[in-house]
Amino acid sequence: MAGALVRKAADYVRSKDFRDYLMSTHFWGPVANWGLPIAAINDMKKSPEIISGRMTFALCCYSLTFMRFAYKVQPRNWLLFACHATNEVAQLIQGGRLIKHEMTKTASA
């Protein structure tokens, strides 16, 4: 069973359809876009003082918009959808960190 699945996957990777997909914007666009969520995830280790509320809000709106686009475009671009879903979650976490930081700052003042 597993051998047949591996063989089928290997055949697909060798196919012209897969090569065409690798050479399309449906692949390279999302690959380039992965820099945003990777940077947001990396910034979670840094102090919340560096978080820009306006930029976090803008990136949340951007990711929501392009999640919808990735779902509506035909054929559906699941790689782009996953990229923006990851970025949306990362930005919401960053926004939560900023709100918590601001609340503790005003409570201690």
Swiss-Prot record:
It is a multi-pass membrane protein. Residues 2-20, 72-109 are mitochondrial matrix. Residues 42-52 are mitochondrial intermembrane. The keyword Transport applies. GO terms for biological process: mitochondrial pyruvate transmembrane transport. GO terms for cellular component: inner mitochondrial membrane protein complex; mitochondrial inner membrane; mitochondrion. It is linked to Mitochondrial pyruvate carrier deficiency: An autosomal recessive metabolic disorder characterized by severely delayed psychomotor development, mild dysmorphic features, hepatomegaly, marked metabolic acidosis, hyperlactacidemia with normal lactate/pyruvate, and encephalopathy. Some patients have epilepsy and peripheral neuropathy. This is Mitochondrial pyruvate carrier 1. The gene is MPC1.
